[in-house]
């Protein structure tokens, strides 16, 4: 392993990240909220630390290896969460402990959306903007966004991109060069953000709210500038805009690229994962609206449909916006919605969860095993569309699922040891590991009241979920460090 190479890249990335603390200074000056110094201090500290890390190894030019890439990704996300918390620590309003500041920053960067803050409507606009910006930067992954910049700095980007995007589709090529691939994803991400902000503004939001909510919508993050989330606006048009862009943001960005390049929407209909994703949302919607109408939770079927549609798309895509307190819904609905976050968005999207692709392959593998029981000698391939899936990919999906289950069990037991009840522990961990945000029980209204140890466990779960577990777990493997 080339530690000087890792150190050099870490320093560069930290210096680049410090720049993200300057836009909130502008917001603070525009609104005169008095919080500009918190971001100035955060910028200076982050920049200086990055500079001190980079200077001793600035002439190191060796190519980054795969193992180095994993270390950079894991280390940078931990460091990023720490330094992303700096403005919260330097701020006097709100006044936050180290634990709360790191929790909020990690939640933002991993696009989880769990928060320890309350009374959002009274907080300085610059703080609110910074939270939303953290989610937007984290949405596509700081590393993926930096892949387009690193080659200009003399650093190879391929290994970083592979480490940041694990899973069944990580080797998909949109363009021949990795730099062009990252840039294509960036343009799509930026284009969707601008379109979403404009749509929110047309629907009735002010400019500030439109920009802030477009950040967290396209990032599938769920942070809001108001305690009541999207429900604050009480505007059906705003809700429909949110539903549309949450739905789009949780679709594989590679698929968006193919559709834009070919100028044909047929690719959405032909893609097995996109079809499964849409079918999953449709079936959830039927069940939720049907049960809301059956229990007469709302005065009309229209209200049931609107509330049901919004919460199904928001929770199933792991965004976490709310227009109502879904944890108070009758019967199985709250738990079923939390379960839907385990599936999450499509692979290659900003959504969390295990991903539709993995769940689809697990289902197809289960069907194949049933066929094998009936016809023991038959060769039954697992197929996506007309293409057979390599056995190595299927094995990888099963490996991910097994590790996910074991990790979930261990972390839930750890949360129970902190004194949390079973419902709160289960939903808090599900919301953290799946990068969802809102939970049930004591965390239905926020995470400020849970024990300090539980906050650190949830923050670790957010990081594991954002990097899809293996990227962090590989670092504790004896094989990884053997040579």
What are these regions (language model features)?
Residues 1-483:
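Membrane-proximal intracellular helices of multi-pass ion channels
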């Amino acid at each position: 392993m080339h530690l000087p190479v890792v150190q050099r890249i870490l320093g560069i990335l930290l210096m680049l990240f410090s720049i993200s603390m300057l836009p909130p200074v502008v917001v603070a000056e525009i609104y005169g909220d008095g919080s500009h110094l918190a971001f100035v201090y955060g910028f200076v500290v982050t920049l200086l630390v990055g500079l001190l890390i980079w200077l001793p190894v600035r002439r190191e030019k060796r190519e980054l290896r795969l193992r180095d890439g994993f270390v950079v990704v894991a280390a940078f996300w931990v460091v990023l969460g720490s330094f992303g918390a700096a403005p919260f620590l330097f701020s006097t309003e709100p006044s936050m402990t180290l634990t709360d500041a790191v929790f909020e920053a990690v939640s933002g960067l991993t696009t989880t959306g769990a928060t320890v803050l309350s009374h959002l409507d009274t907080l300085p606009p610059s703080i609110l903007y910074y939270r939303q910006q953290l989610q937007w930067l984290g949405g596509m992954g700081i590393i993926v966004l930096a892949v387009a910049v690193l080659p200009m700095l003399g650093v190879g980007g391929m290994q970083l991109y592979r480490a940041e995007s694990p899973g069944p589709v990580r080797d998909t090529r949109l363009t021949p060069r990795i730099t062009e691939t990252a840039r294509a994803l960036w343009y799509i991400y930026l284009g969707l953000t601008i379109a979403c902000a404009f749509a929110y503004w047309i629907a009735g939001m002010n400019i500030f709210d439109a920009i802030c909510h477009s950040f967290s919508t396209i990032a599938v993050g769920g942070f809001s500038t108001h305690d009541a989330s999207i429900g604050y606006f009480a505007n059906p048009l705003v809700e429909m805009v949110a539903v549309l862009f949450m739905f789009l943001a949780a679709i594989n960005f590679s698929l968006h690229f193919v559709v834009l390049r070919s100028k044909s929407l047929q690719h959405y209909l032909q893609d097995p994962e996109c079809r499964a994703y849409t079918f999953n949302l449709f079936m959830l919607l039927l069940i939720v609206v049907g049960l809301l109408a059956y229990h007469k939770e709302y005065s009309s079927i229209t209200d049931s449909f609107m509330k049901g549609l919004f919460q199904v798309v928001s929770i199933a895509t792991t965004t976490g916006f709310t227009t109502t307190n879904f944890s108070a819904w009758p019967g199985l609905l709250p738990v079923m919605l939390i379960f839907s976050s385990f599936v999450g968005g499509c692979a290659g999207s900003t959504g969390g969860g295990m991903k539709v692709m993995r769940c689809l392959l697990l289902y197809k593998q289960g069907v194949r095993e049933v066929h094998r029981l009936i016809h023991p000698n038959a060769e039954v391939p697992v197929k996506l569309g007309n293409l057979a899936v390599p056995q190595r990919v299927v094995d990888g999906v099963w490996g991910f699922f097994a590790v996910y289950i074991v990790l979930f069990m261990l972390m839930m037991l750890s949360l129970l040891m902190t004194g949390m009840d079973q419902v709160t522990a289960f939903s808090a961990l599900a919301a953290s590991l799946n990068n969802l945000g809102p939970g049930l029980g004591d965390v239905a209204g926020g995470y400020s009241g849970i024990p300090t140890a539980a906050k650190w466990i949830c923050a670790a779960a957010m990081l594991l979920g954002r990097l899809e577990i293996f990227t962090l777990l590989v670092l504790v493997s004896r094989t990884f460090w053997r040579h």
